[in-house]
């Protein structure tokens, strides 16, 4: 459960993500593809080379979806319902991949935000992204 302080930290850091959605998202996806190469199987029609338009576009979609989740921290299930349906029923993405991408996104935040990505921010974001991953996996049950 996110505390009021967690929510405050998440919102403050998210304000710094604004304007960098495409870059941060593409970098997180690239890190995931390199670190967990089996995740590439969900993107057979993509040019997965670094900086490709498809990876950048999808990265932006991912980060924008996280932005919507930040705006709806108190009602993640409703905010992510359509996305959960899409990944569970249409794309059939193994839910473990949500956690893998979450880890990669946190690395991107730490790299770009440096000292601002404090242990407290890391903890808050970890809880938030774990909650997002859990909601996205709800439809699999």
Swiss-Prot record:
Keywords: Heme, Iron, Metal-binding, Oxygen transport, Transport. GO terms for biological process: hydrogen peroxide catabolic process. One of its GO terms (molecular function) is peroxidase activity. The keyword Coiled coil does not apply. The keyword Iron applies. GO terms for cellular component: blood microparticle; haptoglobin-hemoglobin complex; hemoglobin complex. It holds the Pfam family Globin. InterPro entries: Globin, Globin-like_sf, Globin/Proto, Hemoglobin_a-typ, Hemoglobin_oxygen_transport. Residues 1-141 form the Globin domain. Disulfide bonds: none annotated. Heme b binds at residues 58, 87. Red blood cells. SUPFAM superfamilies: Globin-like (SSF46458). Involved in oxygen transport from the lung to the various peripheral tissues. Belongs to the globin family. Heterotetramer of two alpha-D chains and two beta chains. This is Hemoglobin subunit alpha-D. It comes from Accipiter gentilis (Northern goshawk). The gene is HBAD.
């Amino acid at each position: 459960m996110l505390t009021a302080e967690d929510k405050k930290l998440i919102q403050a850091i998210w304000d710094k993500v604004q304007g960098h959605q495409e870059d941060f998202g593409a970098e997180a996806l690239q890190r995931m593809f390199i670190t967990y190469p089996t995740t590439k199987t969900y993107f057979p029609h993509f040019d997965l080379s670094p900086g490709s338009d498809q990876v950048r576009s999808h990265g932006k979609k991912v980060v924008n979806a996280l932005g919507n989740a930040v705006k709806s921290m108190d009602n993640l299930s409703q905010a992510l319902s359509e996305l959960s349906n899409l990944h569970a029923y249409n794309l059939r993405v193994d839910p473990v991949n949500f956690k893998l991408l979450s880890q990669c996104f946190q690395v991107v935040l730490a790299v770009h935000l440096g000292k601002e990505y404090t242990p407290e921010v890391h903890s808050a974001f970890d809880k938030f992204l774990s909650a997002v991953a859990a909601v996205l996996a709800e439809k699999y049950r």
